[in-house]
Amino acid sequence: MKTYYSNRARIYEEVYFREDPIRQAELIEIKDVLKEKLAGKNVLEVACGTGYWTQYVAETAQHITAIDYSEEVLTIAKEKQLLSSKVSFVQGNAYKLNQLTKTFDGAYANFWFSHIPKENIFSFLEKFHVVLEKGSIVCMADNMYNEEIGGTLISKINDENTYKIRSLADGQQYEIIKNYYSKEELTAIFEPFATDLEIHMNTCFWFISYKVK
């Protein structure tokens, strides 16, 4: 996973500019909701990638600590030259967030949740919530399943995860975890950690928000 996204870093943001009016409208809605809900917050961003979402949330957040494991994507994120008083880009492991030395009252992770192996979800969420204060606002967004986009969804025997093959321009191919969820599944996953849980299942993307218990 890290190798794929590191090698794809320079073209990663192309996924946000597909000429699909429904897709574009939903992306705008996600941006607007993030900016509204995280306004004035000290925010943790998990798997920030190239800083695409960071640049919008920084418009209203008090400060963002944006974490990613890949040096390559962080280099591109830093090229956006966001104010250091507003954003700190940090190389870090999303599965070891409990090692952070500060806490936050807001957090988000966009287009990361689908890449978490299902057997690691609870561990990730436990460590994620360790660094969030009670009442913190959390937002997440990810893809709805569309069989016409992204190639064949691969299932394996005795494996609850699903996978897709991703190809780069130079011909390299990578098999990555890509899991999709129903509203009922998302409810069951997040309810133990959440109050005021809101789940929106749209055409292209799902979006959730909640307050930390």
Model-found features: residue ranges?
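Conserved Class I S-adenosyl-L-methionine
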Residues: 50, 174-211
